[in-house]
């Protein structure tokens, strides 16, 4: 089947690219550096635990609460890495091949344009999803090893994280069918940065004025509909938190996580429906555009 053939070629091409190899090596080095730093910090803490023992928090609970913050910090880093890799790898998914003249050779053969787009989308989706899951479980495993904390909703967190990657992939697939590679990458990057920027502005205005601006909330909602990655990240951060009844035990408060980067509320079901529509429809629009595009 031509679709699976294109998918296999896309996977092989991604693996052969120096960019992907460099990202894998850098990710492994980052994971190693993180493991060493956390080990040093935890060992230093345990060797000086007499200070903590004189307080109301035991060393074990202190480590668990530290694990919560480390989970959010490192999975946020995994979210950034997978998102940036998505933009860099897929901004030229279609446009770069058109510019290089590759499709002029492939398309006359018995391979439909729809199979080319969907096959390339599927290949990139597979490799990006595997990379995201690898980072997710690698960081969680290190943190669990050193602190003993494992999120009770880890698989829900992974699910929303993967949805964010696929949503961004849908956006770059659509853009690659309409505009040149550099323009597509720039648009995706600006939108990706714009979503959390809107959240930060909304948070700052709310803190300063003590009043929630409806206009800013509407703008943030529109941006989250255009690119739902930031809203999905907030859902991921919620799933990384411990159960509500564990917060007092760990000497934590939900107020600690009401920030522009984290959330104490799950993803709204309506947003999940929109994201599913987004992930499926944007590549289909790219197919329709590619059907009419000159090669």
Task: Name these PLM-found stretches.
Residues 31-91, 117-188, 220:
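Secretory targeting signals
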Residues 77-98, 276-292:
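Transmembrane alpha-helical segments in integral membrane proteins
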Residues 37-68, 192-288:
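Terminal transmembrane helical anchor/hairpin motif
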Residues 92-125:
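Helix-loop-helix units of permease transmembrane domains in multi-pass membrane transporters
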Residues 20-28, 181-199, 217-221:
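Pore- or pathway-lining transmembrane helices of multi-pass membrane proteins that form conduits
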Residues 13, 95, 106-108, 168, ...:
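Helix-capping/transition residues at the boundaries of transmembrane alpha-helices
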Residues 5-13, 115, 259-263:
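Cytosolic juxtamembrane amphipathic/interface segments immediately preceding
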Residues 1-28:
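Aromatic- and glycine-rich beta-strand/loop motifs that create alpha-glucan
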């Amino acid at each position: 089947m031509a679709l699976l053939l294109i998918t296999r070629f896309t996977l092989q091409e991604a693996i052969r690219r120096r960019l992907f190899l460099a990202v894998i090596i850098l990710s492994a080095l980052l994971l190693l550096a993180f493991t060493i730093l956390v080990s040093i910090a935890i060992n230093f803490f345990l060797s000086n635990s007499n200070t903590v023992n004189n307080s109301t928090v035991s060393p074990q609970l202190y480590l668990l609460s530290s694990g919560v913050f480390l989970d959010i910090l490192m999975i946020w880093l995994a979210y950034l890495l997978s998102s940036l890799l998505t933009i860099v790898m897929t901004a030229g998914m279609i446009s770069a091949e058109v510019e290089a003249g590759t499709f002029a050779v492939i398309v006359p053969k018995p391979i439909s344009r729809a199979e080319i787009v969907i096959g390339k989308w599927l290949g990139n989706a597979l490799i990006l999803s595997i990379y995201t899951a690898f980072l997710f479980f690698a960081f969680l495993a290190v943190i669990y090893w050193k602190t003993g904390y494992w999120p009770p909703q880890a698989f829900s967190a992974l699910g929303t994280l993967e949805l964010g990657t696929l949503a961004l992939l849908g956006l770059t697939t659509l853009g690659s069918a309409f505009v040149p590679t550099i323009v597509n990458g720039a648009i995706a990057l600006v939108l990706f940065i714009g979503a959390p920027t809107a959240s930060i502005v909304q948070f700052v205005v709310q803190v300063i004025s003590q009043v929630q601006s409806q206009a800013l909330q509407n703008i943030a909602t529109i941006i989250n509909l255009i690119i739902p990655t930031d809203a999905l990240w907030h859902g991921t951060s919620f799933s990384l938190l411990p159960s509500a009844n564990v917060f007092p035990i760990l000497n934590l408060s939900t107020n600690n996580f009401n920030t522009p980067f984290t959330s104490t509320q799950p993803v709204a079901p309506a947003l999940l429906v929109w994201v599913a529509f987004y992930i499926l429809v944007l590549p289909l629009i790219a197919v329709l555009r590619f059907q009419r595009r000159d090669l």
